[in-house]
A protein has these predicted regions:
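Donor nucleotide-sugar binding/catalytic pocket of nucleotide-sugar-dependent glycosyltransferases
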Residues: 64, 80-83, 159, 163-212, ...
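Short alpha-helical donor nucleotide-sugar binding micro-motif in glycosyltransferases
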Residues: 287, 295-301
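Aromatic "clamp/platform" in nucleotide-sugar-dependent glycosyltransferases that forms part
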Residues: 309
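Conserved acidic donor-binding segment of nucleotide-sugar-dependent glycosyltransferases
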Residues: 340-351, 358-365
């Protein structure tokens, strides 16, 4: 091939795309921008969907930007990395900018389906797919108007810009996949008729209440303190500062609380400075790459916060709930739809989040943890994979895996 190589010897033989919808195994080529080693939700979704496509008998291929080119076989299928420049001010995000190289790679791969997880810089691939007669879907991971508002764009201007962007997206792709009704609204608003719903999911075996670690909790909080956890990328659209404001409000009210932040991003230095200047008990862990360690932290918390107002699903919040930990989420996001009555929502202010935390912790410990886990069990990855394959007019060819029993949660000092 031209430019992409690896230990497996390049792209391999080109084969013609299938002509019948969902006929036999499909080569599903997936493209994603704005990924980084320390990014969380998108990388998790890409990995789990790829694993699910493989298990269903299909051939997933993922193309992402990176520091250098590589071509690897992984649990999620083939992963091809093309060199992409760093995006300034994003804390490590890279983008695919060489259109000719990406187009050439797509031609060599000869996909049966194309799945794009970037609605801006990769939108041109929808036109490529039309010319190549390859059915293509775009996955909406964040609302356009929501992101624009978090960047300070006035609401009216953000809505007009989002509508224009979404019209072009809907016209370019065969289908637009939205993970929640919340995400779907901005496309319904413009009259798009090619929108389908497909939720994301959570690994209910990897994330479970038995990950609770009394020793880990004791390292971060005393027995009489509330352990609040924030698992998110520290960037503007995620609004991590709301968590610090909520902690400060709780402390003013006399509550004993500490905050542990798992995540990295461009706002980290500013947040650390704010915590120091205000004397807030905040621990910044940075990016936690060990998924077991992150799960133990989520399971050992009293409550997890999800303050991002533009979230269209909220994987980190769902993972916390699978661990038996309730979530307080932004009422402006899709999270109310995901967490249901098992968590709480709040306006995008620290005081409101503090209110929600205190109200949530008034519920009996066992009841709130059982409710969180039960709600998460509605969102297994098998359901998500089936929905995404349906959006591709693809079929699953293997039975659902048997879920291993989850050990019960044993309370130990929370409350």
């Amino acid at each position: 091939m031209n430019g992409v190589s690896g230990s497996d010897g390049g792209i391999g033989p080109v084969r013609p795309a299938s002509t019948a919808a969902g006929a036999g195994p499909l080569r599903i080529v997936r493209l994603a921008n704005f990924v980084a080693p320390a990014s969380g939700g998108l990388r998790t979704a890409l990995r789990e969907l790829g694993k699910g496509y493989r298990a269903a008998g299909h051939e997933p291929v993922l193309i992402v930007p990176g520091e250098r080119e590589s071509d690897r076989w992984t649990e999620q299928g083939r992963v091809i990395t093309l060199p992409g420049p760093l995006l300034p001010g994003t804390g490590g995000y890279r983008v695919l900018t060489d259109r000719r190289r990406v187009a050439r790679l797509l031609e060599e791969l000869a996909p049966d389906r194309l799945e794009v997880s970037d609605r801006t810089t990769l939108r041109w691939t929808g036109k490529w797919a039309r010319r190549a007669r390859v059915p293509a879907v775009m996955v909406s991971h964040e609302t356009a108007d929501g992101v624009l508002r978090t960047w300070g764009v006035p609401e009216g201007a953000a809505r007009r810009a989002a509508d224009a962007l979404n019209l072009r997206t809907a016209h370019t792709y065969a289908r637009v996949v939205c993970t929640t009704e919340f995400a779907e609204r901005e496309f319904v608003r413009i009259g798009a008729r090619n929108v389908v719903r497909a939720p994301l999911g959570v690994d209910l075996v990897e994330r479970h209440p038995a990950l609770y670690d009394a020793g880990l909790r004791a390292r971060h909080a005393r027995e009489d303190q509330t352990l609040v956890v924030l698992c998110t990328r520290l960037s503007v659209e995620k609004r991590p500062g709301t968590a610090l404001e909520a902690l400060e409000a709780l402390l003013r009210r006399g509550a004993r609380a500490v905050l542990v932040v798992a995540g990295d991003g461009p706002l980290r230095p500013r947040l650390e400075q704010r915590a120091r200047e205000r004397g807030l008990p905040v621990t910044f862990l940075g990016h936690v790459s060990d998924r077991g360690a992150l799960g133990a932290l989520q399971a050992s918390a009293d409550v997890c916060l999800a303050p991002g107002p533009a979230e269209t699903f909220g994987l980190a919040a769902l993972e916390a709930m699978a661990c038996g930990t309730p979530v307080v989420a932004s009422a402006s996001s899709a999270l109310p739809e995901v967490i249901g009555a098992a968590g709480a929502t709040a306006a995008d202010r620290g005081e409101a989040f503090a209110d929600a935390v205190q109200n949530l912790l008034r519920r009996p410990l066992a009841a709130r943890r059982e409710a969180a886990r039960a709600r998460a069990e509605c969102f297994g990855w098998r359901t998500a994979v089936d929905a995404f394959l349906k959006a591709h007019d693809a079929t699953a060819s293997v039975p659902a895996p048997v879920t291993a029993p989850v050990p019960p949660f044993v309370p130990g000092g929370l409350g």
